[in-house]
Amino acid sequence: MISYYFQGFALGAAMILPLGPQNAFVMNQGIRRQYHLMIALLCALSDLVLISAGIFGGSALLMQSPWLLALVTWGGVAFLLWYGFGALKTAMSSNLELASAEVMKRGRWKIIATMLAVTWLNPHVYLDTFVVLGSLGGQLAMEPKRWFALGTISASFLWFFGLALLAAWLAPRLRTAKAQRIINILVGVVMWLIAFQLAREGVAHMHALFN
């Protein structure tokens, strides 16, 4: 059964490593050393719920509800455009230290709300967990399925805590004005690129619904 664990771990790692909204948010919180371990835990727990739902049968709900998929997609587009705009606005600020200080003033609950939006309004999360993992893990018998899910969940926990701790460790180098400007530009551009990609997918979904 251990082979199913490592299959799940490898697939989970492959899906979570690319830079996306979740990773960017965890990295920034790590650099700020602001509730970064709490955010890593909440991201990993969110993945645990989504992965379990996808592998143990929840994928059918998404696949059979095109309007739900469309709603999640356009909600994700709106959020990513807003999130990217905020990052670019901070990067282009004439007083980057003041802009960064304003971000640091955000309370715990606002940070948690942003994390939940970053996770649950990202349609790619549902495609990864419900479609990819659901189609692969759903074919397995119950015992191998459990090991496969455990491997995928382990990759998520290891990655988010590793990213948060690494970012916090590198914080003295990454907190400089130049580094912060580069990071915010990178995050903003990536968020907008993902948003435009999702918008194209959303248009295709809407076209399919009305034809």
UniProtKB/Swiss-Prot annotation:
GO CC terms of this entry: plasma membrane
Localization, UniProt: Cell inner membrane
GO molecular function: L-arginine transmembrane transporter activity
Pfam families, per the entry: LysE
Key words of the record: Amino-acid transport, Cell inner membrane, Cell membrane, Membrane, Transmembrane, Transmembrane helix, Transport
InterPro entries xrefs: Arg_export_ArgO_enterobac (IPR023445), LeuE-type (IPR001123), Lys/arg_exporter (IPR004777)
Annotated transmembrane regions: 1-21, 37-57, 68-88, 111-131, 147-167, 179-199
Catalytic activity: L-arginine(in) = L-arginine(out)
Role summary: Involved in the export of arginine. Important to control the intracellular level of arginine and the correct balance between arginine and lysine.
HAMAP family: ArgO
Family: Belongs to the LysE/ArgO transporter (TC 2.A.75) family.
Protein's name in the database: Arginine exporter protein ArgO
